[in-house]
Amino acid sequence: GMGVSGGEEGARYGPSLMPGGTIEAYKYIEDIVVKIAAQVNDGPCVTYIGDGGAGNFVKMVHNGIEYGDMQLIAEAYDVLKSVGGLTNQELCSAFTEWNKGELESFLIEITSYIFAVPDDKGDGELVDKILDKTGMKGTGKWTVQQAAELSIAAPTIAASLDSRFLSGLKEERESASKVFKEAGLGDIISTINVDKEQLINDVRKALYASKICSYAQGMNII
């Protein structure tokens, strides 16, 4: 089998390919996959991974790392909005700047765009109307299960999976929120004064360090 990554852009401009199986079989298709793969400065985004389902295994871990990436971005957004009080315009600017440096990536880029999308059926931006409930295809869970089987710590990826589980419990979360409010536990974070520029820089550094951890955990599983 062969893992494929790249989405719509990959289909148009070349994907990242992770072929597995026998090396003899790979040699038959090597010329083809090298040509259709995405091309970067140091060569095509394809390499022979190994026997059997090794290619699909790497793709599974790739998705697990991406789970971690998305959760880290979500938490960075939450801190900037909830603690820093950044507007969607300011969030868009911050993520746009981040995408010019060490955090440059597809996920950071599209996140910056999301903040600027207007709600064509109401006021404000669409990001504030998105249902805070997510689903999953299973590859993140498989990655965490495999890490456990191998006795390998993957806390960032595992925490991102837990967050998805909690995300699905919307009714329970809303009920718990009412209990907290009835107990007099309000939103004290909104009363905190912070230096926005300092917070943006601190969150950028924290996000970068956390992403390195997520990638390291995935590579350790492989």
Q: Where in this protein do the model-derived segments appear?
A:
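Rossmann-fold dinucleotide-binding core
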Residues: 1-93, 100-125, 129, 167-194
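Solvent-exposed, charged interface segments at domain starts and junctions
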Residues: 93-98, 156-160
